[in-house]
From Swiss-Prot:
This is Phosphonates import ATP-binding protein PhnC. Part of the ABC transporter complex PhnCDE involved in phosphonates import. Responsible for energy coupling to the transport system. It comes from Burkholderia mallei (strain ATCC 23344). Its EC number is 7.3.2.2. Its main location: membrane. It is a peripheral membrane protein. Gene3D superfamilies: P-loop containing nucleotide triphosphate hydrolases. Residues 4-252 form the ABC transporter domain. NCBIfam families: ABC_phnC. It is found in: Cell inner membrane. GO terms for cellular component: plasma membrane. Pfam families: ABC_tran. One of its GO terms (molecular function) is ATP hydrolysis activity. Keywords: ATP-binding, Cell inner membrane, Cell membrane, Membrane, Nucleotide-binding, Phosphonate transport, Translocase, Transport.
Length: 307
């Protein structure tokens, strides 16, 4: 059974622009897959369709999560909220509520699995709090549990979002450009944490990335989009310069500026040593820096209510 299965998915926006066209995609449980493509290629649209934040075109299509249909023929399943319990979504803009503590933000992940009276009262059990403490420790920010989320750096906020997915007991993590607003050191930590959660918890990870070198470094499989269509789906090691040029034009050489060997994830998957040339990550020694775009509490509260 696939963790995610998509068949013949298309999405047209109200202005008539095609966001996605005839997408077929299957991701096995425990895979870590990078979703790449130029701006406007459909990466974010595809992730939001998988979570069924909006409906697809009204034509024969389906999106299944662990064998259950979350969306079919342009209609979202009635029990979509229940099905979203299995999906942890990490947004580009940090999806925490700034005025709440880090611990409380992480505990929000438990809301979908607790009785209604506890949701309304905002009361969490001792077991919930123990799980939150364990999750915060796993992502390396346990010492910040009592602080307001607004005090965290950008990278720390993304790690808190991953801790919330653990408390949620999500089986899939959809990460929409989670490192786009981070400095290189913070980006590396977030990607290493995603890889650790994938390996240690067998979580299925689908992460959209603008940085091709990061995708090749951390993800054994790459899915590339162009103009809403899948133009490549396969091992990162087989993503050639020619294919990259078709996706990125004259900028396709940038990930290979310091050398060609930036594919350790693919080498490890094949049982080979993970040799690679240095990337921008390797010279980054600075601590996490606060992001210049703080989270919006209204947006994050809305996001948490959708789980």
């Amino acid at each position: 059974m696939d963790a995610i299965r998509i068949e013949r998915l298309s999405k047209t926006f109200p202005n008539g622009r095609k966001g996605l066209e005839d997408i077929d995609l299957a991701i096995a449980p425990g895979e870590m897959v990078a979703l790449i493509g130029a701006s406007g290629s459909g990466k974010s649209t595809l992730l939001r369709q998988i979570a069924s934040f909006s409906s697809s075109d009204a034509r024969p299509s389906r999106i299944d999560i662990f064998g259950r249909s979350i969306q079919r023929d342009g209609r979202i399943a009635r029990d979509v909220r229940r099905m979203r319990r299995d999906i942890g979504f990490v947004f580009q803009q940090f999806n925490l509520v700034n005025r709440l503590s880090v611990e409380t933000n992480v505990l929000i992940g438990a809301l979908a699995r607790v009785p209604m009276w506890r949701r309304l009262a905002g009361r969490f059990s001792r077991a919930d709090r123990a799980l939150a403490a364990q999750a915060l420790g796993e992502v390396g920010i346990a010492e910040h549990a009592r602080e307001r989320a607004a005090n965290l750096s950008g990278g720390q906020q993304q790690r808190a979002a991953l801790a919330r997915a653990l408390v949620q007991r999500a089986r899939i993590i959809l990460a929409d450009e989670p490192i786009a607003s981070l400095d290189p050191a913070a980006s590396r930590r977030v990607m290493e944490m995603l890889r650790a959660l994938n390996a240690n918890h067998r979580l299925t990870v689908l992460v959209s990335l603008h940085q091709i070198d990061v995708a090749l470094r951390f993800c054994p499989r790459v899915v590339a989009l162009r103009a809403g269509r899948i133009v490549y789906d396969g091992p990162s090691a087989a993503l050639t310069r020619e294919r990259l040029h078709a996706l990125y034009g004259d900028d396709a050489h940038l990930p290979f500026a310091v050398g060609d060997e930036v594919r350790p994830a693919a080498r490890e998957a094949a049982g080979e040593p993970a040799r690679r040339a240095p990337t921008a990550f390797d010279s980054a020694g600075s601590p996490d820096l606060p992001d210049s775009q703080p989270a919006s509490p209204r947006r994050m509260l809305a996001a948490s209510s959708m789980r």
